[in-house]
């Protein structure tokens, strides 16, 4: 073939186009195979019962299907022909693409044979690689086609529908059907077709021999050669890493294995005639049990080769070689690759450390980075495909690696390092190209003995392009593009590799060497990202998800590997490289796989990290709990009740000495590892993983690992705080607020101390968690401590206070439990004193306290509703009493007619107890708010001072609402006003409601004397209150009155004066009562009048003096005091 025709044949261009096209066709075949093997995605026609007979008929008669005379068999197809055409067109066209691809491949292979091209991976690398890639791709397409079980049905059904619709078969069907039949036994047919190409294929493969042997060395040989080491020879550290064929140094061993196995499988004739071919083939058979066709589709090397060769004459020795190689691979390959992975972990870690410390070395030693990536990728992919396919083995440990995460992490680290310092790489290689490569190339071109015009033009353009480079292009961040130069070199390789070329590349190896060097240097300027994909793409995991997940789970169980777990979500970013433009329908599925697994891995990592954090928090809380004041009681007791030295030296058996706080830090030996040590170690490793990268992209989605950790920590902290409260709905047990607060502070202080290590916003986590705890439900709909404490105080403490088991002691500023038969499950004073109320306010915050108030007010309003009913029942009598309260004779007849007076007092007392508790909670809130926000508390108090009785009521309530939110007490309770306003009146007018409110005060006033009959109505000086909580009546009377008359826009003071007058008259009339039972605690009840005045901002002692003489109060105090001290004297002193 003439040189002119060699130029016109465009071998380089055709190889480039056909290889890309072949990958697309291969992926389409894979997609059809995958789709048809899954009943969920299979074409619906293949699953319909009515189609079964049609499908059997088409499969049996294929490709000679008589559509016109087979209506009884193809009736269902005829009915749905349009739908079948619409649905199966893509499938059919994909098979047609295979046929057309086959035609073009054979045309090109025959042309290359005719040109008698010379292939040598060390010289014409691109030409040889493209040639071998095309053969492997074509073989993979045919093998995958033969693995599609429904191929005949898909093609035959489409053609039947096409003929029914258009009256004739599809033009491609006859050839397509014949091709499908021919490749029912694909390898047999392929070996026949490739017989004429044996010389070219074997020549290309033999050029791999030296390279494959060198790249297939064991870990010991690598170690001896100090492979990938930059520090083994310090003087040569900055020398550029060069090779005669740079691309061969990072060429994948997996790719070479695929070339050799499939090449010799198709062109097996040379194995019997050429000992070098035989050696290379046997060496390759000893390396792997499986090679990849595409994604997870593999070729079982030894079985397939043995089956083929067994059917051929004269191949008995080769079959024996296969069996021997298989046994060697099973016995040794697992350990061989295991040792290489161990070596790479050490060597690449050293390389990454040096390059990270001195990134300038990435200039001269960039090749080392890509070699490291390629070596790691080869070992990982070998492990993955063998783990997936070798199911029965005596040595399963050969196909499992608990330390694989470290290799994956190092791969990601090298990739990140190259990306981060790409400018360093560009600056170095630009200078190399412009100041060295171009000079060497010029010398070589000038020394060529023969240089045809076409080749001369191409090489002159190389010199021109390289001479124009300057450093400003890198500084100005110009985009480089040397794709034209590389394609020209590919063309030049093709031109100089044909047999009749005037300029032969194999006769001018120096030209090949310098051009291969130039190609690598040009890639360092414009194709670094492509190089990273070529050498380190691990998108294979997208199709080995079970193995991927298993590796991740194994890594989580290995404490020393935890820091490398971030590599797994980072590798999900590789999945985007699986996409091919000829199969766009795959994109959503690949995207879902990538995002789902990335999300799953990060969720598991965040979950494990948050679990570890919360476990340490729990330990810190336990240590903090040991320092609580309650635990020093035993120490104080022992110190107080010291006995003899002997007794102290010999403590009783069964009474172990309690460890003092801090004892956990004492160690006799540092090798003793505590649970806390293990947790801290695990947390350190996990924190390194979660904080390794700020963000990364997966299929155009930006992923922030810290956000996963933040959300998990927030949720776990929420649950932990609720768990700390220790609420038991059955026994109504709960932790004291002060103890819960101490525990929460221990949790928070530890989490905040981790802020710089976790990479998460600790302040935001804590803030959000605590804020959610101030709401009734958290973000996941679970109960919070606000709900738990609100329910507990209402259902336990206040309910028992209403029944008289618990008493409010103003002297102690707490509720206290009264001694009763049977043990109480809690002590009221431990949950309601000043410190506890302050702690409660600290935990619940203003929002939580508002929720508590709203619940308290609901209970108050429910009592008010009942009180209104009682007033309405006694309306007529109360109206008369209100008019005639100063007439003793008439009152004596009216009072007995009242019903439910005791009920009124009881319900009003309950309201008073609730409001008293709320007041205590508000005081706690005020103290906390003042401590946290003094700059806010000042203006709020100042604003409250500006409110006068003349201020508009809406403005007043708004200001009071603000003040109440900060815990400041107000003359009128806005929460109570709002709660009463929300009560639904039974079609009653405001005037009637107002009348009921007035009569309620009258009812209370005339009912007060009834309290004197209750033995519990004795005023206790010690408690500064009554054992039946009637001192809470005063708060109820004042606050309910203020709320009611504010609501009805009436004068509060006037109505409270009326109450004072009526109550005074009622109590004064009690003084004339002769029945001792009715006057039993008259003096104690009289004191209520003073308590009412003290409680109210609207009443004064002068007002009280005008209707109830102060002398009576003074006498009452004296009598109550005398009776109290008499009761405390021992019985013998009476």
Swiss-Prot record:
GO molecular function: GTPase activator activity; protein kinase activator activity; protein-containing complex binding; TORC2 complex binding
Phenotype on disruption: Mutants exhibit lymphopenia, neutrophilia and anemia. T cell development is disrupted at the CD4(-)CD8(-) to CD4(+)CD8(+) cell stages and T cell activation and adhesion are impaired. Neutrophils fail to migrate in response to chemotactic agents and are deficient in their ability to phagocytose bacteria. They show enhanced Th17 cells production. The anemia is microcytic, hypochromic and characterized by abnormally shaped erythrocytes with aberrant F-actin foci and decreased lifespan.
Compartments (UniProt record): Membrane; Cytoplasm
Gene name tied to this protein: Nckap1l
Coiled coil: none
Protein name, as recorded: Nck-associated protein 1-like
Main location group: membrane
UniProt superkingdom: Eukaryota
One cellular-component annotation, GO: cytosol
Pfam families listed in its UniProt record: Nckap1
Summary of subunit composition and partner proteins: In hematopoietic cells, component of the WAVE2 complex composed of ABI1, CYFIP1/SRA1, NCKAP1L/HEM1 and WASF2/WAVE2. Interacts with ARHGAP4, PIK3C3/VPS34 and PPP1R12A/MYPT1. Interacts with mammalian target of rapamycin complex 2 (mTORC2) components, including MTOR and RICTOR.
Membrane topology category: Single-pass membrane protein
Keyword line: Cytoplasm, Membrane, Transmembrane, Transmembrane helix
Region of interest (Disordered), ranges: 638-671
Transmembrane parts of this sequence: 999-1019
